[in-house]
Swiss-Prot record:
Signal peptide span: none
Top-level division of the source organism's lineage: Bacteria
InterPro entries associated with the record: G_ERA_dom (IPR030388), GTP-bd (IPR006073), GTPase_Era-like (IPR005662), KH_dom-like_a/b (IPR015946), KH_dom_type_2 (IPR004044), KH_sf_prok-type (IPR009019), P-loop_NTPase (IPR027417), Small_GTP-bd (IPR005225)
Its membrane topology: Peripheral membrane protein
Gene3D superfamilies attached to this UniProt entry: 3.30.300.20, P-loop containing nucleotide triphosphate hydrolases
Sequence segments annotated as region (G3): 73-76
GO MF term list: GTP binding; GTPase activity; ribosomal small subunit binding; small ribosomal subunit rRNA binding
Protein name: GTPase Era
A family per Pfam: MMR_HSR1
Domain KH type-2: start-end pairs: 216-293
Compartment(s) of residence: Cytoplasm; Cell inner membrane
Binding site for GTP: 26-33, 73-77, 135-138
Any one GO CC term of the record: cytosol
């Protein structure tokens, strides 16, 4: 939805620019990352069927008319069990605190469940403008949607309610227009052609982590992380990328490698294809799997992921 251009010359009343930060808050798998990618028009946040995919704040940027909207995709709000969980939830609330507008994303298909109710309760004292976004509405009957919207608005005084499908884009244009009209007047925060503030090295690692999530099941992906250790631009215009998949135990390493290395090879092929499409360059991707016990308690790993280490 980057369909605007920066106004030329001095600002007038008709062309005055707007800009602001919009945080997306919701339970895991509510569709926050899918919505960010839909509004931005390309992938800036990874999406899988697994919950708790987003770990750190990811900012996606789109332009709507004279407005530049910075979307802050936060980790899902849930009851933390591990140190990493605590860091993710703390980061999510931190992202909301600094935003001009908060989008509260609820999976309409999941209904008004315990997670949704707890999330709404926590939003009562939030002072920023709050917008309710019911996602996945294409899978729910209209009477159920209306009932869900009514219950949510009885708990929290939302400024607006939108019903969308982040996956197919239904309702997203209206949401984008509303955000563009609602962010404050002011200069743009980022250059016109920038769609994210995530470094390419980190995005490449996130893409590989996404393919790891999609390929493997159970708890293994949550005991793993991916880091880009080398990025070399080559004379022929291609790029050589070396990444390390860290796991906590030798048994997990065997699962990631697979029989004769077939699993990690498939992960690498899928990641290489997508990274190449984003860069519009030939990519030579090399994956290594290493055991690092208790990486989830290593402050350095948290810094790599853009998280504060919880004490």
């Amino acid at each position: 939805m980057n369909n605007g251009t920066s106004p030329a010359g001095g600002e007038t009343e008709a062309t005055q620019t707007r800009s602001g930060f919009v945080a997306l808050i919701g339970a895991p798998n509510a569709g926050k990352s899918t919505l960010v990618n839909q509004l931005v028009g390309t992938k800036v946040s990874i999406v899988t069927h697994k919950v708790q995919t987003t770990r750190a704040l990811v900012r996606g940027i789109f332009i709507e008319g004279p407005a530049q909207i910075v979307l802050v995709d936060t980790p899902g709000i849930f009851r933390p069990k591990r140190r990493l969980d605590r860091a993710m939830v703390t980061t999510a609330w931190g992202g909301a605190k600094d935003a001009d507008i908060i989008l509260v994303i609820i999976d309409a298909q999941g209904g008004f469940n315990e997670n949704a109710e707890a999330l709404l309760e926590s939003m009562k004292d939030v002072r920023q403008k709050k917008v309710l976004v019911l996602n996945k509405v294409d899978r729910v009957d209209p009477p159920v949607l209306l009932s869900l919207a009514q219950k949510a608005n009885e708990l929290v005084p939302f400024d607006r309610t939108f019903m969308i499908s982040a996956l197919n884009g239904s309702g997203c244009k209206d949401l984008a227009k509303y955000l563009a009209e609602s962010v404050p007047n002011g200069p743009w925060y980022y250059p016109e052609d920038q769609i994210s503030d995530i470094p390419m090295r980190q995005l490449a690692a996130e893409i590989t982590r996404e393919k790891l999530y999609l390929r493997l099941h159970e708890e293994l992906p949550y005991a793993s992380t991916v880091e880009t250790e080398r990025w070399e631009e080559r004379k022929d215009g291609s790029v050589r990328i070396e990444q390390v998949i860290y796991v906590e135990r030798e048994s997990q390493k065997k699962i990631v490698l697979g029989h004769k290395g077939e699993t990690v090879k498939a992960i690498g092929q899928a990641a290489r294809k997508e990274i190449s499409e984003i860069l519009e360059q030939t990519v030579h991707l090399f994956l290594f799997v290493k055991v690092r016990e208790n990486w989830g308690n290593d402050p350095e790993r948290y810094r790599e992921m853009g998280l504060d280490f919880p004490t």
